Curated annotation (Swiss-Prot):
Molecular-function annotations in GO: manganese ion binding; RNA binding; RNA-DNA hybrid ribonuclease activity
Source organism of this protein record: Saccharopolyspora erythraea (strain ATCC 11635 / DSM 40517 / JCM 4748 / NBRC 13426 / NCIMB 8594 / NRRL 2338)
Enzyme Commission number, as recorded: 3.1.26.4
UniProt-recorded name of the protein: Ribonuclease HII
Residues noted as binding a divalent metal cation in the record, renumbered to the chain: D17, E18, D111
NCBIfam families the UniProt entry points to: PRK00015.1-3, PRK00015.2-2
Primary localization class, coarse: cytoplasm
Cofactor(s) the record lists: Mn(2+); Mg(2+)
HAMAP family registered for this protein in UniProt: RNase_HII_B
PROSITE patterns listed in its UniProt record: RNASE_H_2
Encoding gene (name): rnhB
Gene3D superfamilies reported in the protein's UniProt record: Ribonuclease H-like superfamily/Ribonuclease H (3.30.420.10)
Protein's job: Endonuclease that specifically degrades the RNA of RNA-DNA hybrids.
Catalyzed reactions: Endonucleolytic cleavage to 5'-phosphomonoester
Cofactor note: Manganese or magnesium. Binds 1 divalent metal ion per monomer in the absence of substrate. May bind a second metal ion after substrate binding.
């Protein structure tokens, strides 16, 4: 997809992806990345960040930082996710990430769904992080950035094990959340966070979006540690 657009003179082509959409704690991180034509073949092992080992992600992160034509990373904190709702926050993060690229893209590839208002022609690519190098690069940037943030949050809130599950709805995280109740880094737009808070007589410390469906943690959001 990216190489076809480059050959037609529609570049530079930027990819956009996120990390943390399914998590019930921590920020949503969105990255945009434009690569030079042919970079996908030169970045050995570049693919969807979720199928890479942590060491492989770190290696590719450094390569992308050094060699990308342009990149940007946007961090949307938990309180903003609560205020906007996760889907709106995701769309807004993608718009911000593309807008902050130092090189205006000729085309933007998004992973799986259409994003209006990107300021350039765009197309949604199913499994884009597996088939488009620029989307894969964006996924690595977002994932590594978010994992580092969650490791830092573990130092502040060690009882939750953020360094292990990275804020996703694992059985271990759910057990810790039930035992201790949520902290300020949890997202109150998730049903499991609200349920744990009620056990401890806690109320949301901030305004939470009431858009339909945003209080549900979907089955697809529940993952094993091995998938993170």
């Amino acid at each position: 997809m990216q190489s076809a657009l480059d050959r037609r003179g529609l570049g530079p082509v930027a990819g956009v992806d996120e990390a943390g959409r399914g998590a019930c704690a921590g920020p949503l991180v969105v990255a945009a990345c434009a690569l030079k034509p042919g970079d996908g073949r030169r970045f050995e092992g570049l693919t969807d960040s979720k199928v890479l080992s942590p060491a492989e992600r770190e290696r590719l992160y450094d390569v992308i930082q050094a060699k990308a034509l342009s990149l940007s990373v946007i961090v949307i904190p938990a309180d903003e996710v609560d205020a906007l709702g996760i889907h709106v926050a995701n769309l807004e993060g993608m718009r911000r990430a593309v807008a902050q690229l130092s090189v205006a893209p000729g085309y933007v590839l998004t992973d799986g769904f259409r994003v209006p208002g990107l300021g350039a022609p765009s197309v949604a690519v199913v499994k884009g992080d597996l088939v488009a190098a620029c989307v894969a690069a964006a996924s690595v940037l977002a994932k590594v950035t978010r994992d580092r943030i969650m490791t830092g949050l573990h130092e502040q809130f060690p009882v939750y094990g953020f360094d292990e599950h990275k804020g996703y709805c694992t059985s271990d995280h759910t057990a810790r959340l039930t035992e201790h109740g949520p902290c300020e880094e949890h997202r109150w737009c998730y049903a499991n966070v609200v349920a744990a808070a009620q056990l401890h007589g806690m109320r949301s410390p901030r305004t939470v979006s009431s858009k339909p469906g945003l209080f549900d943690a979907f089955e697809g959001d529940v993952v094993d540690n091995e998938q993170l």
